[in-house]
From Swiss-Prot:
Family classification: Belongs to the protein kinase superfamily. Ser/Thr protein kinase family.
Disulfide bonds: none
Protein name (Swiss-Prot/TrEMBL): Actin-regulating kinase PRK1
Coiled-coil region: none
Catalytic activity: L-seryl-[protein] + ATP = O-phospho-L-seryl-[protein] + ADP + H(+); L-threonyl-[protein] + ATP = O-phospho-L-threonyl-[protein] + ADP + H(+)
Organism from which the protein derives: Candida albicans (strain SC5314 / ATCC MYA-2876) (Yeast)
């Protein structure tokens, strides 16, 4: 038993550590600034009144923070079987008169008491010293390694993980029941990333030299320039050294002829070549156990196993079928607390949302659409409404707005037409019958739609169309979702088909220009509110530019193109402050002009175009984006170069000749060529192929 130092506590000294009253029994050992004692505590811990007291005199605040890390680590690992249990702690300032040692510092010193579980059977190193002749058997080694690996795995499963950094034989204790426990967390840290600059590299090197044991250091701790972090794989390396020493009572890289630390570090860095197993009689172990040592002592930390993988291999060697739980007790309690709090919050939110939903989603007492009887107009067309108590049918996996029931099977709306098929079919039947109905039901849906359509027809100045035609147009607009641009003028079905064909080909209207001008005037008279200037189409403006003479030619400029760049800052502010929503002026509707080659008056226009070379503009206003300034005298416009004459054999017949050849009858405005006409044209254009 070592002799106590002069400043050590004597037996019977009474102290208070946290909430425990302590009485010193005897002095055990010392290390660094720490003294270790056995003591009695009140109240007892886990039925035992004997505990271990660690007294540390800290010379600076920086070392005080390191000691606090040890206390916090033991507190987080409290309640685990293979780690020395934390009981209580206390810290206080220390005066110069109470300092330990011979050196008195002018800095403020601190005194820290750490109360821990007492292990009666001392440490593992003491147990191995009793077995110097009869060394540990492989079964005993596997059992010790199994328990220590569980303690290391628990450190690595904390949140955040805890790196011990000083795993060795001397830091394993044995309690009264023969359980091996990991202790001394004074060197433990969290994950340490690789250094980023020379200053960080030097600080990390000094820290490792102070808080680690040279024989147990990993290669990444010696050569920091490799850029590997200090993480759990460094503890795995130390476990490999620990296992080797259990087997051979020495570390694998110690040599009798080593005289310096640099030689030891050089041997560790070349571990792939210097690792050897000194098998002797009485210390011959299985290849599986040697392989476990080899994988832990790999130079590349990325190729080493983690604590759980190593524990699984040791458990398999021990004969265990399952791996024990290595999640620390504190983490389990933290998860339970979070789950309980989350469940409580969800319950409160659920109750609050239930109350709000109950207030918001309260159903109205009356249905606003209950008074609409759709059977009145559906029965007229032969349709029967399906009963409300019909059998439930399978609905396709689509949104409710994407399908409908036709009475038999669910069907999907087509993307091109959004109307319901029942309305479409009804419209088709009504159009096929060609009969008009009188709806006297004031609450019917079609009566409401008909009244809305009549209002629109009155605004568009109906010119003689029948009620039947207006009703058809209204139903067509409902079923297709489109808009009918032209008013019905009472023409026959044949003329309507011809007009629709012309409108498809030309993209215009089925009225001539005169009639369109009259309709435009009617629209202007019926809509006196719109006062916006008439907007000319692109074709109309191009025609005006072509028809203008030299006197009316407008000077070309770039005005209007810089409207976003030539403005001042005040204009920018006004533009930004300008409200985005504005009332849209009502546009004046006018059908586009019919092309000359499809118009009934194209012969007259061609004759007039052949006699006149210039096209004067009739009372046309200049364009809004072009300046109305006379051209300068200095600018002389050059006439375009003469166009070369086309050879006779490449000339194609004119549009007039083609129209005359393709016309089949005088009554039809649009006619298609037959096969004989096409053959004649082909023989004329390509005589060599006939």
């Amino acid at each position: 038993m070592p002799q106590p130092p002069p400043n050590a506590y004597k037996a019977g000294t009474r102290l208070t550590v946290g909430s425990h009253k302590v009485s010193i029994i005897k002095y055990i050992s010392e290390g660094g600034f720490a003294h270790v004692y056995t003591c009695t505590i009140d109240p007892p811990f886990q039925g035992s009144t004997v505990a271990c007291l660690k007294r540390v005199v800290v010379p600076s605040k920086w070392q005080l923070s390191l000691l606090r890390q040890e206390v916090d680590a033991m507190r987080r690992l409290r309640g685990n079987k293979h780690i020395v249990s934390y009981i209580d702690s206390h810290a206080s300032r220390l005066g110069d008169s109470n300092t330990s040692g011979t050196n008195h510092s002018q800095q403020q010193q601190y005194e820290v008491f750490l109360l821990m579980e007492y292990c009666e059977n001392n440490g593992l190193i003491d147990f191995m010293n009793t077995r110097l002749v009869n060394k540990l058997t492989e079964k005993e080694i596997i059992d010790i390694m199994y328990q220590v690996t569980i303690g290391v795995a628990m450190c690595h499963h904390l949140r955040p993980p805890l790196i011990h950094r000083d795993i060795k034989i001397e830091n394993v204790l044995i309690d009264g029941k023969g359980v091996f426990k990991l202790c001394d967390f004074g060197s433990s840290v969290n994950y340490l990333p690789p250094p980023r600059n020379p200053q960080e590299l030097q600080l990390m090197k000094d820290d490792l030299m102070q808080h680690t044991t040279p024989q147990y250091r990993a290669p990444e701790m010696i050569d920091l320039s490799k850029g590997f972090p200090i993480d759990d794989k460094s503890d795995i390396w130390a476990l490999g050294i620990f296992l080797y020493k259990l087997c051979y009572y020495t570390t694998p890289f110690e040599r009798p002829n080593q005289s310096s630390l640099q030689e030891l570090e050089h041997t560790i860095l070349n571990c792939s070549e210097t690792l050897r197993f000194s098998d002797q009689p009485g210390s011959i172990f299985s290849p599986r156990l040697k392989n476990a040592i080899k994988v832990c002592l790999r130079a590349d930390p990325r190729r080493r196993p983690n604590a759980v993988q190593l524990l699984g291999e040791i458990a398999a060697m021990k004969g265990e079928k399952t791996i024990p739980n290595v999640v620390p007790y504190s983490v389990i309690e933290q998860q339970r607390t979070k789950q309980a709090s989350a469940l409580e919050e969800d319950t409160k939110k659920g109750q609050a949302s239930f109350v709000e939903t109950k207030k918001i989603t309260s159903k109205p007492k009356t249905d606003p659409f209950a008074n609409i009887d759709k059977s009145k107009f559906l029965n007229k067309s032969g349709y029967k409404l399906s009963s409300v108590t019909a059998e439930s049918r399978t609905v396709p996996a689509r949104p409710l707005s994407a399908f409908f029931d036709d009475g038999n099977t669910p069907r999907i709306y087509s993307q091109g037409n959004r109307s319901t098929p029942s309305v479409q079919d009804y419209v088709k039947e009504e159009l096929a019958k060609g009969e008009s109905y009188e709806f006297n039901e004031p609450d019917g849906t079609l009566e409401f739609l008909k009244s809305r359509e009549e209002e629109k027809l009155n605004q568009r100045n109906d010119t003689g169309g029948s009620f039947k035609a207006a009703f058809k147009n209204g139903l067509r607009k409902i079923s297709t979702g489109g808009n009918i641009s032209a008013n019905n003028t009472g023409s026959s079905v044949k003329s309507n088909r011809r007009a629709s064909l012309k409108r498809i080909i030309t993209g215009g209207s089925n009225h001539n220009r005169k009639h369109s001008e009259e309709n435009t005037k009617n629209v202007e008279d019926s809509n006196p509110v719109s006062s916006a200037p008439k907007k000319l189409s692109i074709q109309h403006r191009m025609q005006q530019l072509l028809n203008q003479n030299d006197h009316q030619r407008v000077q070309k400029s770039a005005q209007g193109y810089g409207k976003y760049t030539d403005i001042k800052a005040s204009e920018d502010i006004d533009e930004i402050n300008k409200p985005t929503l504005s009332k849209h002026s009502q546009k004046k509707l006018s059908p586009p002009a019919v092309p000359v080659n499809l118009s009934s008056q194209r012969n007259k226009s061609q004759q007039s175009s052949s006699t006149t070379k210039k096209y004067p503009i009739k009372d046309s206003k200049p364009l809004s984006k072009v300046r109305n300034n006379p051209p300068k005298d200095s600018v002389k416009t050059k006439p375009p170069p003469p166009k070369p004459k086309k050879p006779v054999y490449l000339k194609s017949p004119t549009k007039l000749e083609i129209a005359d050849q393709r016309r089949l009858s005088d009554a039809s405005e649009i006619s298609m060529p037959d096969l004989d006409d096409l053959e004649k044209q082909f023989s004329k254009r390509f005589p060599s192929y006939v």
